[in-house]
Design a protein with these regions (language model features):
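A SIS-like phosphosugar-recognition module
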Residues: 1-128
Length: 128
């Protein structure tokens, strides 16, 4: 709480990551950012290399076992290479056997997280 969320996902869960960003904006009234792997590794990665861990961000990785193995590996390698340069990510493993199940699960969790965040910081999530 009190930190801006930065949400990352692979191509399969990126629609949900973008929805989390919008929900943080609308429900919790917080600025939030999102990006997707592998694009993150081409440009945005470098932005974290000169940052300090104590920055006011919370990194959230939305992960799916259905992502291509190379995308899954990028999450792991990125976490190792950026250790100490960015906040340790909060890893959310999508539940469900199919992509549709996983997307619906992650959408619902994101709405719950952002509504609960608003309530914890004393905000009314209803006005948009």
């Amino acid at each position: 709480m009190g930190k801006s969320p930065v949400i990352y996902a692979g191509p399969k869960l990126f629609p949900a990551a973008y929805k989390w960003k919008i929900s943080f904006n609308e429900n919790a009234k917080q600025v939030a950012w999102t990006n997707q792997y592998p694009e993150f590794n081409h440009n945005e990665f470098m932005g974290w290399t000169k940052q300090h861990v104590d920055k006011t961000y919370d990194v959230i990785d939305l992960r799916s076992k259905l992502e291509h193995p190379r995308v899954q590996k990028r999450f792991e390698v990125t976490e190792r290479l950026l250790s100490g340069m960015r906040p340790a990510p909060i890893v959310v493993e999508a539940e469900g056997e199919t992509l549709l199940q996983q997307l619906l699960w992650v959408f619902a969790l994101g709405d719950f997280v952002t509504l609960y965040t608003a309530l914890l910081i004393g905000l009314n999530p209803a006005p948009v």
